[in-house]
Swiss-Prot record:
Taxonomic lineage: Eukaryota, Viridiplantae, Streptophyta, Charophyceae, Charales
UniProt-listed Gene3D superfamilies: 1.10.132.30, 1.10.150.390, 1.10.1790.20, RNA polymerase Rpb1, domain 3
Top EC group: transferase
Assembly mode: In plastids the minimal PEP RNA polymerase catalytic core is composed of four subunits: alpha, beta, beta', and beta''. When a (nuclear-encoded) sigma factor is associated with the core the holoenzyme is formed, which can initiate transcription.
Residues bound to Zn(2+): 220, 294, 301, 304
Gene symbol of the encoding locus: rpoC2
The UniProt record lists the keyword Transcription: yes
Pfam families hit by this protein: RNA_pol_Rpb1_3, RNA_pol_Rpb1_4, RNA_pol_Rpb1_5
Species assigned in the record: Chara vulgaris
Name under which the protein is recorded: DNA-directed RNA polymerase subunit beta''
Amino acid sequence: MRQFKEIPFYNQIVDKGTIKQLIGRLVAHFGSTYTSHILDKLKELGFEYGTKTGISLGIDDLLITPSKKWLIQDAEQQAQASDSHYNSGNLHAVEKLRQLIETWHTTSEYLKQEMNPNFRITDPFNPVHMMAFSGARGTTSQVHQLVGMRGLMSDPHGQIIDLPIQSNFREGLSLAEYIISCYGARKGVVDTAIRTSDSGYLTRRLVDVAQHIVVRKTDCKTHKCISIQPFLEEWKMNIHLYVQQKLIGRILADYVLKDNRCIASRNQDISFDLAIRLLSFKFQSIWVRSPLTCESTRWICQMCYGWSIGYRNLIEVGEAVGIIAAQSIGEPGTQLTLRTFHTGGVFTGDIAQQIRSPLNGIIQLNNSKIRSIRNRYGQPAFVCLDNIHIKVKGKDTYQSIIPTESLLFVKNNQKVQAKQVIAEIRSTIRQSKEEVNKNINSELAGEVFWSNKYYFKEQNLHDLQKNNFFVKNNHNFRNCPTSDSQNENDSNRSNHFLTINSIKYSQEKTNWPISNTGHIWILSGQVYKFHNIQSIFYKQQDKVRIKNILAQKELLVNNGGRYHNFHSQRLSYFQENLMNNSYTHSKKKTKSLSSNFVNNAICGLTILKEKKGKFSFLKNSSFCKKTRTNLQFILEVKNYSRIKHNDLLATLHNPAHRTSTAGMVKYGFLLINSQLDKNLKSYNKNSRKKKISLYQNNQIQPGQSLFWIPEEIHEIYKPFSFLHVKNGEIIQKGTYISEDIQCGTSGLVEINKRNRNHYEISIQPGSLYFLKDKQIALQKDQILIAPGEKIDNTNISDEWLYLKYLKTDQGVSVLFARPAKEYKIDLINHLEHASSLETLYMKKCFDVRISHYTPYEDGQKIRNNAGAQLISASLVFKLNNQNLAHKAEISWTRIKFQRKISYYLQINLRDKILPYSYSLSELKKLKFNSHFSNKNKQINNIDEVILGDTIFHTPLLTKNYGCIRTFSRRRQDNKTSFVLLSSSDQLELPLPIIFFAFISYKRFFNKKLGLIGNLYTKKTKLRNSNQNLFLNLFFISWYIIDEYSCNFLFWGAFSQLIKDARNKYSHNCFPIIIKKAFFSLGKFLSKIEMKILGNLETELGQVISLCNKKIILRIGKPYLATRGAIVHPRNGETIREGDTLMTLIYERLKAGDIIQGLPKIEQLLEARRENVVELIVNRYFLDCTNLLTEELGMLLGSLWGFQFSAWASMERSKLDLVFEIQQVYRSQGVYICDKHIEIIVRQMTSKIIILGDGMTDGFLPGELVEIPRARKTNRAMKSIMFYKPILVGITRASLNTRSFISEASFQETTRVLTKAAIKGRTDWLKGLKENVILGRLIPAGTGSEEIILQRLMNLQKIEKLRKGKSKKYTTSKLDSLLFSKCKSAFLKRHPLNPYCRETFHFILKQQITNSF
């Protein structure tokens, strides 16, 4: 009789886990029958005492932890500190979110940990406490939501909502908390109705893929195995019991040795006691057998499977473990959806392992092994470069070893308190991370400025240096891109404001990667952005009032016709008269007169002898993008020549508008003859007249298109008999037209006879469409059709086509569709220029426009195979008001800079204009008030208008009083922006008493200098080394930042900067030293500097004004940008509130599917492309290949290295897939045995895909074949079959089996049966499903006749070996009885034909003999 060990006596309070262990031990010792009797007694005992106790559950039983109040207050203080650091620019948005999550998650976890001691102390028999902490019903997390706090929630996508729910269900939720709570929750009714069907379908697919897996033999004799790493698994799941459950029931694959002592032997099953013993020895890895490594082809052996979960013993031969595995995985799929968080997706996680100081003392460590970094929460820390020893010296001495790559929060010789966190251990587990982009939106409207720490990455410099744009170099904005407005202003300023060979940038670039951590400032201001502005009435530094007109929009005529028109072409004026300004320009006296009238639009009627405007076509034209690709205008005028209205200045031949073949031109528009001035300048050269004529007649308007129908044309000067092609013949590319001419394209041949022995042969590419209706074909003859239009009743074009009607010799109507290429002219932006008017308003008297024209007529054929310039562009001189000036003079300057030659044009108006003054009454007579009238106003006057005329104007008004700070104009998209700086955007602070420096004042001038203030000489005496740094410097009392430029220079009467020769500070302004802090013009003040000024508010900003007693700041907000962040606006550009400022790129751990559990399982089991396992396989293959190439390349060779890498990566993918599936289930409290998942994964990874083009091996390319079958084929065939392993989903694996009956019963029945009939496939009925379909007994089960026969054979083998007889088989009574039983059992199951019956005796005897 079997002797059992003594069962230990349990005298403790048991919970759910202890009950499981107790039942397992009872089954192992007494069997299932006796165990069920014991459990019945235990159940009756529980019901009896439960009834006597009278346990009930009420709302009063929900006791709230007393420590909740101060824990939440502490968390709120930490959250406020994070907000303060974020507003000061010390943290960015991601670090702030991480700190918030860490703070509230830690608070929630501490509150959860306080629940159990609180219940034990106050009410140990509390029903909620007994129910939850025993595991009878509910979890600790759910009770925590009842009596603690709900904490952080996650939305349906798994993202954490940064607003924690501080209340619990006992206290009740507020409206906002309830909405957030419901956002992550799911409805139970919908979930039950929809998700349960998905779970059932998952079970069906799993059963189909694994139904034939049956335990057929005892041992497959394999030496392959997998390793279980106890400590790694423990870190993964953080549950020691999980490792025991993975070990219990497994079979050891090798001997386990400890100090040359055998702990366990090969093929020994791991019991509960052995598992505890193995874990106690702390082995790094334990090698066990697994279904993944079983050598059996279509089934599995007993040793590789291990224990039966139900009986705690080895699985019996004949068990259908495939169906058991499918049901064990599919059935909890219902639980995945039904027992998920109906109360919402509560964020749960583990607190990082931290090391705390056990006592008060001083830290001692080696500084050479640490390096300062910024941790993921934005806090300063130190990373350990190696394992370091740390000591805490106090009353006692505490020593510890900090592993490498851990984080230290203390430094050497620092005092620490008891329980203070001194280090954080980095996890050694390879955690799956994903890269996330976080868009940061601006919380302030204004201007964008980059700090001086930003530099481009080295790999971007080569691309950036190709462009012709300079950047100013000042002490606050270095080596960063500037806006277009700064480039415009720079062209009119002196050269010492520019830094040559500085970092350049491309105007097309909209994303700027940051290589160093720094700040991006947004300075406050009201932003006005306009599109398609024709008239702008203000410049920088102009002051405006409320509802002043900033600019105006004009509605232009797009087509000719009769429109409502205004009589007056003049602008309205201000109410006040401006002063007459006299100035000297080029030694000629000029006067200007401006007036102000009722509608607040600034305008000026100017009396002048000379007016200059400079143009830089290289830098400021709308063709700047094309100019950067080395496109250049060809000047058509002489230097210092006179020009008139509508004269051509230069032409441009764009290669993008040049064709590469011969062909035909078709207009995609109705030709509009330009209304040019009749008095065009006459030129001596004929080419000049020809270009003017072409410009007049064939001008192309913006938005119009030309079409090019390509063809190939050859001229043959030979008799017709020498031609190798016929008219109407379709030839291919490379066909010889004659003996020495070969065509370069495919198409239809058209032969035209010019003269005798002179033929023109045209090869026209295209397609032929036969039409029955001749009238329809004639209607579509010689027309263009757009993409998406019908060619005939059945065909739709996918590109521009040119249709041509043809008729065959048989009289059939054919449409010949030839491809047409579109050349479209984009909308034209007028060139900007700077003027020298000295009034507040600058009105354009002239303009230079770009006009496009074509030299070819509609339908004209170009016979040159080299192509032609289809469209040309011209610069045309326009006078906006011909009453002011009639003639002009043009000159150009040739400038060479850095091996590049640029031409700058200058146009001077030469005609003298008589002064004229309008009175208010005269302006009213001229109806100036109607100029800015509402666009909905009915206008009675009707006049004939043409293309380009203005119908009416729309004014754009200001909203507040202030000063224009920035004027930016971008030509690419015709956008104009202003920043209006008002009093609400500024902050005035008094300067405190100066303690650090002793300053004496001496009045130098008593005269007031307006905004500049008074002039003083200050003698500054400084202590220590700075004593003589600022002695006897020439200071200005009041400094104002130059609002016109981004360089922080002075403007006004005294702008000279005098510095001491020994001054080492590279500031462009005089600093004021207060309490060891420098306050200089243009400086961005930090929070510490604001506290020195006495400002306790949160506003930060930039110094724009300094005086003796006060400092004026422009309010701003800093944003921290870390390395790798992408900044969208350029430096100096405007941004509105809510616009995207930058994109932070950071890594985060991939969140488990808290809500979407079942779809995650389907994604893994179906091996979809977004599967994480596929990415892991590819990365592991590359890593393994590199390792083998470097270390074992000479030994193995590259071919064997790749083969080994493929095998290793596929083996690794199996384990990763098992872990990913297990992780989803365990995240929701469902435990599934690893062996069951391994059986399914084995079926998913047991196939290969055929490679190659031929069929020499009997398989088609792309066909799925089992791995053993492919290896047998390779051994049998002379030619090697190439294949690669593949990860197949369960649905695809079910449709690629050896049984076509099983495949047809699953999906695609017609296709599977048809394919099987064509191939003549044979189904050997080896699976369970096909036998059930045909009504046969299934070949599985411990009581099946085949299994009984196998057992008898094994018993006979054991008996023979025990008696020591020879292996030769001898007949005896036992043998005869065994033979007869096997024969009867086999013939009952398989009704064989006579041939099989005759050979059965020999086959059965041979099998029995071989088994011995």
